[in-house]
Amino acid sequence: DMLEATHKDPQAGCAPKITLHCTHKNPDDAQIFDAIKADNEPTCLHLLSRVQDEIYDVLEEAPLYSVLEPIDISVDPNPKPQNLTVLVFGAGDFGMQATRTSFWMGRMPGVRLNIVVVDPNARTILEREAARYPEMFGESCNGMPTIRFVQAEAPSVTTDRLIAGGTVTTLHYDAQNKCVSSTADSAPITDDARLYAFVTMGDCGQNLSYSLMLQRQIFNRFIDQGSPDYTKQQPVICPHIESEE
């Protein structure tokens, strides 16, 4: 009724301007409302996404570039770009928002962005997301997809399996053939990767527990592999926690 009332023709000279703030979950909502927007309407619709706001807050508090070395933008092209690898465990609402936002915010000079999403329903989710954003999910650099999916339960995929030497089957969207392709990938995460992880598997306790396990695995990798100093690289792991307990 409120929406209907606000769309009645206002009296001349006293047209009210009403702003409606609505929460939403569907990432397509903004495009839908933009498409039906009419000129000279007395109402203004402002969409709010709790999921999007929370991911933005995380990336404002701990930006993606916090895991990188200082970037010298005066060098063009950069002789050896840094490898920013974003891990997303769980491809629900929060996980996919983290994936999309990381894709937008991870576009920095002198940086090679690599996003790996782990979920038991990876193929179905990738097909859905690629239909919405084919250019995003079909992007590749030197033949390497920017976004890849691993179809597995997150706890069963340790960082050892995702690092060079641990072969897993990865999925990516083939933009040319407009289909999802699978590849036996021996290095979803390279040894020189600067790691930033989101853990969004649903349950707060599970997210926290897996984040701690992931931190130990990454730390052990630095010790065992003789990789660059853990304290200098400072990987970032962001578990999704809703409970205040």
Segments (PLM) and residue ranges:
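Cytosolic regulatory regions of ion transport systems
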Residues: 1-245
